[in-house]
Amino acid sequence: MPIIKSAIERVKTNNKANVRNTAQMSAMRTAVKKFEAAKTAGADNVDDLYLAATSAVDKAASKGLIKRNKAARDKSRMAARYAK
């Protein structure tokens, strides 16, 4: 455990950021999985789920949770899947 006050504060800050980042990554993954499942099942709301998934990927990239190249790759794969 840290002894210096600033180190204690950094541990608290890092824990808060970790919780926030984990939640946003989970939400992004869930949105992508919902789109994939709906596309496979041939659901009616595929359009809305596609927009939600691409938005979630863009948001994760803008927050620095994933790299821009991974975001572009994921969106490209979803777009190809959406077009089929």
UniProtKB/Swiss-Prot annotation:
Transmembrane segments: none
Gene Ontology terms, MF aspect: small ribosomal subunit rRNA binding; structural constituent of ribosome
Protein name: Small ribosomal subunit protein bS20
Functional summary from the UniProt entry: Binds directly to 16S ribosomal RNA.
Taxonomic classification: Bacteria, Bacillati, Bacillota, Bacilli, Lactobacillales
UniProt keyword list: Ribonucleoprotein, Ribosomal protein, RNA-binding, rRNA-binding
Cited Pfam families: Ribosomal_S20p (PF01649)
InterPro entries in the record: Ribosomal_bS20 (IPR002583), Ribosomal_bS20_sf (IPR036510)
Family to which this protein belongs: Belongs to the bacterial ribosomal protein bS20 family.
PANTHER family in UniProt: 30S RIBOSOMAL PROTEIN S20, SMALL RIBOSOMAL SUBUNIT PROTEIN BS20C
UniProt keyword Thylakoid, yes or no: no
Cellular component terms (Gene Ontology): cytosol; small ribosomal subunit
